[in-house]
Structure formats: C-alpha cells, structure tokens
C-alpha cells in the first residue's frame, strides 16, 4: 500500500483529498497543526469505514514541528511515496503591494512558501527511499504570471496579491526542485483545485471541497515519471 502525507488535511480540500486517496487504497497521513483536529478528522473517516488513515501533528511554518512529524513518520514507515503540500493561508485584506502590510506578506509566505520548502526538505530522504515518488504543491491560478499579464486579464485577481505572490513563488519552487531531482525518481508538480468553497475564502468558492480535491487526486495517482515541472488544473495545464 502506497503512503501519502497531506499537510493541512484535517478539513477542506486536504481532508477531501485524504478521503479520496484512502478510498483508492492509499495509506494516508493527515497532517494537522492541531493534533485534536487531526484526530477528529480521522474519526470522521473511520465512521464511514475508512481505516487506512492516521493523523500527524505538523505546523509547516514551525521547523521544529516539521522535524517532529518527520521523526514520528520514520518510526512507522521506511519510505514515503507521495507528499502533498496542501497547507496554506490566505492572509488578511487588503493585499495590494503599494500600501499593504509587509508583516501580513511575511506571514503568508512563512506558511505557503517557506513552510512548503522546509517540509519538503525534511521529508525528501523518505521520498528518495520510495524509488518512484511524487511531490505535489497545491497552488492557485492567482499565482500564474501568464494569467496576470494576458490580454483581457481578470482584474479581480489583483485583490489577492499577497496570497497570489506566495503561489507564484511556490510555482517557481516546483519547477526548480523538479529540475534538481530529475534523476532521482521523484517528480514535482503544482496543481490548482480551482475556486473552492473553504474557510480560506469564507466559503465563497464555486466548487465543493470534493470537486476541488479531484485534480489533486488525479495527479497523485498518475504514474508517468515524465510528468514533472508542470502546473495542472481540472481538465488540463495552467500556463506559468
């Protein structure tokens, strides 16, 4: 049974991703900043007959927490097949660069970018032991430079410059790490769930968490080692 770690998996898209992968016979570790919330999420899955799940406490913005999570998993598994970097925060409004709060920007980057980087670094040795592993970074179209500069662009995305720039950085990390790991058997890709109703956007998204999880799951279960350094959405690729 392949093993998966999903950060931010006690609710929303992360929880739905965990549910769907567990139903496909993956063993899923649900990462949660709060251990109790993680246990509650596991119970919800147990209550519907899903038992191939456990929780692990991990705050991706806290390196000590990340290391403790890695040490915990090392006592349970010899390798990790899939790491899904899902944990993220939206940040406060306003998010314009001209006058926005730099401390807000730092907080968002600490989780969405630096948190992803340090989590990936800590779990990379376990991923390398898999033989064929995948790192999936959950991104957003608001981080796409191509969409931000296209003719007739959606100016509504300008409301999310703090969040969006953290995802732009995340996408750069995806490409550069994929290039670094090209001969290791580890593929690295970004994926956007789309505008999904979660607490990240006060449940205003058009998609359900179940729908938002689908492109993540699709990417997780594909086995083509040549698919790396790409940015996916439901139904295709996204321009960087």
Residue ranges and their predicted role:
Residues 89, 93-109, 128, 132-182:
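Catalytic loop of short-chain dehydrogenase/reductase
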Residues 1-29:
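Canonical Rossmann dinucleotide-binding motif of NAD(H)/NADP(H)-dependent dehydrogenases/reductases
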Residues 24-40:
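Conserved glycine-rich Rossmann-like NAD(P)H-binding loop of the short-chain dehydrogenase/reductase
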Residues 50-52, 72-85, 91-93, 101:
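A glycine-rich helix->loop->beta "capping" turn
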Residues 84, 119-123, 127, 173-174, ...:
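Hydrophobic positions on the long internal alpha-helix
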Residues 35, 56-69:
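The beta1-alpha1 cofactor-binding region of Rossmann-like NAD(H)/NADP(H)-dependent oxidoreductases
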